[in-house]
Amino acid sequence: GSNLSYGVNFSLLSDIHVTPGNENETQLLKAIEEINTNDSEFVILSGDLTNEGSDQQLYNVKKILGNLDKPIYVIPGNHEDTWSQSALKSFNDIWGNDRFVFETDNYVFIGINCGPYMKMGDGHIKHEDLRWLELELASRCTDGKRVISINHYPIKDDLDNWQDYINVLQKYLLLFYHIK
């Protein structure tokens, strides 16, 4: 018989809401020390890195996270989108993208932006991101790989096109949608 191990160790951070000098900044520095000494292979940050999502705050968090000794994968939350395309452009300029995909031996990790595009609006995944999700999963989900999908919002409660998202994901072996 097969002796496949599906174990993977990683750290997940979310809603850290760092503003220069606030308590969350201190807590993040402590978390980084812990992560650097634990057996996590990588770190995922699933949104709300900052309070206001200003360029200054985003650069500050990026600088702090530069102390991590492990790869980090980041998606924005509603505090980074600040409910505008220009804020999202700043996020992409600083972090390189608002989505990620990578594989380990047995998993495909995929993170997608589902930020609102109107102040206080529901979360929404853009059509082109749903298409990207479909293409990435179709090409990567081979040999029994399981999908770990990361997004900022609880899917059914706060995502206006959650059914479109589920329609893509349900074709694959999923572990979870959202940690709440």
Where are these regions (language model features)?
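Short acidic, glycine-rich surface-loop motifs adjacent to enzyme active sites
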Residues: 140-157
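Long, structured stretches of catalytic cores involved in phosphate-ester chemistry, encompassing
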Residues: 156-180
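Active-site-proximal beta-strand elements of phosphoester/diester hydrolases
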Residues: 7-20, 106-116, 148-152
